[in-house]
Amino acid sequence: MKNLKRSPWAWIPTLYLAEGLPYVAVMTISVILYKRMGVSNTDIALYTSWLYLPWVIKPFWSPFIDLLKTKRWWVVTMQLLIGAGLAGIAFTIPTTFFFQASLAVFWLLAFSSATHDIAADGFYMLALDSHEQAFFVGIRSTFYRIAIIAGQGLLVTVSYTHLRAHETLANL
């Protein structure tokens, strides 16, 4: 059986886009969502600041990620959990307990995203030799930054424009 090695161009850009978008959802979009839903600034600051904890403690649980299963398994599983978490946020908004429910889902997103970061970086290190790692470090960083820009700027702008259009139509 042949050992087929896929081109890093086939997976590095999308892997690092997928790494950046959930981070933006947890750290930026959660704050905007809670502000638009009428949560007080004090509560927003207190509860959303705790959402950063999974990224802070990544070094403590990364050895467990290295021991259990493969990096690819962790990447795929975390991407599925992130997708479910993003859908979960949408389902929690119309509830009467949206703040508590969405905060729990944002916690799931934060831990899934931080675990995805560990697995993605580990997969990158295993799949590429040192020369390829040196070549792709800028590409990986660029696509992560594109995800940050798209999540913070583009998505927020589009949603704000969409919201304003609906408010204008409602006032007619």
What function would you assign to each model-found segment?
Residues 46-63:
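Central cavity-lining transmembrane alpha-helices of secondary-active solute carriers
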Residues 151-159:
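Small-residue (Gly/Pro/Ala) motifs that create kinks and tight helix-helix packing interfaces
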Residues 80-96:
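C-terminal ends and interior cores of transmembrane alpha-helices
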Residues 4-51:
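Helix-loop boundary and gating motifs at the non-cytosolic
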Residues 98-116:
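Hydrophobic core of transmembrane alpha-helices in multi-pass small-molecule transporters
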Residues 67-79:
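Cytoplasmic membrane-interface "Motif A"-like loop-to-helix N-cap segments
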Residues 138-152:
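Glycine-rich segments within core transmembrane alpha-helices of 12-TM secondary carriers
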Residues 161-170:
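Conserved small/polar residues in nucleotide/adenosyl-binding loops
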